[in-house]
């Protein structure tokens, strides 16, 4: 399981000219499930994202988590994170899940995340999404579980 999280001042996702997710201060997380991912991977990734301290405290130190500041998050499914880019000039997606399995796994991850945290919005799996954000920092981290 892969994720790239970005601390944002605001972010939104638009599908077919309809805004499907819209947050103010919080996290935009690009999420990729892989073939071997299990519920345990989803639990660990959710905990990592929710508890990771990327927001500044009063002293200006990155010492507060999403949960600490009660901010919002958008989970955006993004299979391209699984691309193998080592060879040639065209990405390979051999480690990715078939779309129908990936969709189920992403939904399972979303459900686990929602059980742990209540300010969650999502993009739409398989849709052509327009993702906009104002990155705060920029502060961006990459996770592999």
UniProtKB/Swiss-Prot annotation:
Disulfide bonds: none annotated. It catalyses: glycyl-tRNA(Ala) + H2O = tRNA(Ala) + glycine + H(+); a D-aminoacyl-tRNA + H2O = a tRNA + a D-alpha-amino acid + H(+). It is found in: Cytoplasm. A Gly-cisPro motif from one monomer fits into the active site of the other monomer to allow specific chiral rejection of L-amino acids. A motif (Gly-cisPro motif, important for rejection of L-amino acids) lies at residues 137-138. The gene is dtd. It comes from the Bacteria. This is D-aminoacyl-tRNA deacylase. An aminoacyl-tRNA editing enzyme that deacylates mischarged D-aminoacyl-tRNAs. Also deacylates mischarged glycyl-tRNA(Ala), protecting cells against glycine mischarging by AlaRS. Acts via tRNA-based rather than protein-based catalysis; rejects L-amino acids rather than detecting D-amino acids in the active site. By recycling D-aminoacyl-tRNA to D-amino acids and free tRNA molecules, this enzyme counteracts the toxicity associated with the formation of D-aminoacyl-tRNA entities in vivo and helps enforce protein L-homochirality. Keywords: Cytoplasm, Hydrolase, RNA-binding, tRNA-binding. One of its GO terms (molecular function) is Ser(Gly)-tRNA(Ala) hydrolase activity. Homodimer. The keyword Nucleotide-binding does not apply. Belongs to the DTD family. GO terms for cellular component: cytoplasm. Its EC number is 3.1.1.96. GO terms for biological process: D-amino acid catabolic process.
């Amino acid at each position: 399981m892969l994720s790239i999280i970005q601390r944002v001042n605001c972010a939104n996702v638009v599908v077919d000219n309809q805004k499907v997710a819209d947050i103010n201060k919080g996290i935009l997380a690009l999420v990729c499930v892989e073939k071997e991912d299990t519920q345990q991977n989803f639990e660990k990734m959710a905990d990592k994202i929710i508890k990771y301290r990327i927001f500044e405290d009063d002293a200006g130190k990155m010492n507060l988590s999403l949960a600490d500041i009660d901010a919002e998050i958008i989970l955006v499914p993004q299979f391209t994170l699984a691309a193998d880019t080592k060879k040639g000039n065209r990405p390979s997606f051999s480690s990715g899940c078939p779309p129908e399995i990936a969709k189920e796994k992403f939904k399972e991850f979303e459900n686990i995340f929602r059980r742990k945290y209540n300010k969650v919005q999502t993009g739409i799996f398989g849709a052509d999404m327009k993702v906009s954000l104002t990155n705060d920092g920029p502060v961006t981290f990459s996770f592999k579980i």
